[in-house]
């Protein structure tokens, strides 16, 4: 029997489940089970679809406006979740930076965006204004720290898109 569930931040959100032959369930586990039961209701997915479409529209609009202001759009992290985002939004990224040599010198599926090493950060001019889109959104802080360590342009921007679109400096 499920007697506890612990929410963790791994991969956006994961759970550790505690099982026991006893059957006394804490209130937060009962609440979690009640919340999970909503996954059987199509209305849950209709609301979710509207939320996702809103994030997409805001992200595309934000990136388009920054591109009009002369910003270069560069992705970081060729994670599967990022490829899903790109194929849904069709963001016109110049390239995607990834630290994994097995992904470098390849192209993103569907969008055919070149995947390059982080050495390309050294080739950017000091005058280049860049909007970085961390495609592995759950590693936003780590990706941002890597970029800032190599490049410190006060005009650069970083865009979060989950759970909402937010531009950071």
Task: Set out the residue ranges of the language-model regions.
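Glycine-rich adenosine-cofactor-binding loop
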Residues: 66-87
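Conserved S-adenosyl-L-methionine
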Residues: 1-11
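A short, well-structured juxtamembrane/interface segment
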Residues: 50-69
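Structural motif
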Residues: 72, 95, 130-131
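NAD(P)-binding Rossmann-fold cofactor-contacting core
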Residues: 94-108
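Flexible, glycine-/basic-rich loop-and-beta segments that form/coincide
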Residues: 11-51
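Phosphate-bearing ligand-interacting subdomains
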Residues: 112-169
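Substrate-recognition/cap helix-loop segment adjacent to the acidic, metal-dependent catalytic center
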Residues: 84-96
């Amino acid at each position: 029997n499920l007697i506890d569930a612990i929410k963790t931040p791994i991969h956006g959100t994961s759970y550790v489940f505690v099982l026991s032959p006893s059957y006394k369930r804490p209130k937060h586990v009962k609440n979690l089970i009640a919340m999970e039961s909503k996954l059987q209701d199509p209305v849950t997915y209709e609301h979710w679809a509207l939320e996702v479409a809103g994030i997409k529209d805001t992200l595309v609009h934000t990136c388009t406006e920054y591109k009009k202001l002369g910003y270069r759009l560069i992705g970081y992290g060729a994670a599967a979740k990022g490829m899903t985002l790109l194929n849904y939004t069709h963001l016109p990224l110049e390239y995607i930076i990834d630290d994994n040599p097995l992904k470098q010198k390849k192209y993103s599926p569907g969008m055919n965006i070149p995947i390059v090493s982080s050495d390309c950060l050294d080739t950017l001019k000091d005058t280049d204004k860049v909007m970085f889109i961390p495609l592995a959104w759950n590693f936003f802080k780590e990706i941002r720290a890597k970029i800032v360590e190599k490049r410190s342009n006060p005009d650069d921007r970083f865009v979060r898109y989950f759970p909402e679109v937010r531009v950071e400096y």
